[in-house]
Every structure is written in structure tokens, then in C-alpha cells.
């Protein structure tokens, strides 16, 4: 977890072939870890945006006790450029693979654990505005947040946590419900809590999930124990007519 200064990008001895090509970087696999190499236009440290990115990523790399954030490790620079950084390999899949057999209780546990790590980001005055489906991975037991390139300094610690928490919450609810519209429920309590979360007035994410499960169970007169149970009830249009 350090800044490593090299003379040029050749010193990194990158593999001949990249593993992935993203819009602003290339990903390589080397020695059991990923190397993310920034595009040339995003490297110059004389550019304030690139310099700030280096500073934020350095601060993130120094965080301790993190389990569910795939943070940068070594940051590689030259005299004039921020070349990129190494990062651990995460074997999770996108949240689209959130299977129907997973229990609601496990979803709640995974969300709570990831939120604890997200709170550690906000506590050091950093906001990650890039929490979306491609950056949250799932491996049956845990959720992981990846890709911190767009993180910024943010003075309001409480607001930073609410912004990140709301983004994660909406993503999880969307995947749990398989994109079914919550308006189908037409429930005052559900709509009220959802609105407060979206307006950054509340962090009742877990309470919402539990209430949603309870409301669907009452409406369907069935036990709602898994993601599949919830989706099956939502597919039953007769319940919502």
C-alpha cells in the first residue's frame, strides 16, 4: 500500500495482452493481481484532476480493516505521470447474478457489512459517486465494491454516507425485485420510507427491506424467505389488482 515511483511505464513490465479494456483504462493480470493502467490523457500530474485522483486513491489505499472494498494497492507514478495502480482480484459476479435461492436475511447481512466499509470511506471525507451495477459484485456470501477512480473529497461526512448508502440501497432493491416497480405495492409506509431515503433524509435501508418483506408476505399470505419468494409474489398480478 504505497506510492511506487518508476522511471517509465516500461518498468512495470506489463503483459503483452490486456485482460480488459475500459473507456479510460486497461486492465492487466500480473503476479496474482490486477494492474489498472490509465489512458495517456488521464496521467499527467500537472492536470489538477489527475493529481487529485492520485491523492484520493492514496488516502483510500491507507485504510485499514476493510473487507468488502477492493481498494487500490500500490500506486505507480513517474516524475510527471500517474500511470495506474495494482488492485486485488475479486472473483464476484455482477448483481444481475443475484440468484432466487438466496435468503433475504443473507442479503440484509451482506448489505450491512458493505455499508460498514462504505461508512469508513465517508469518515475520512471521501465520496464515491460511482456505485452502480457494474461496480458492485456478488459471490454468494458477500458484496464487494470495486472501482474508486471517480472518488472525490467531500467535507460533509454524513451526507457522503447517505449518498453512497442510497445508491447501494436502490441498486439492491432493483436487483432483489428484478426491476419490478415498487408502485405496484401502492403502500403508504413503503413509499414514505423510500422517498425519505431518496431525498437523503434517512438511512433506514435495512428497515425498508424488512418492511417490504412483511408487506409482501401479508398481501400474499405466504412466507417470504428468499429473493425468489419475493419475485414470485410480485409476478402474481392477481395480488396487485
PLM feature spans:
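Catalytic-loop of the protein kinase fold
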Residues: 118-138
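C-lobe/activation-segment region of protein kinase-like
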Residues: 139-241
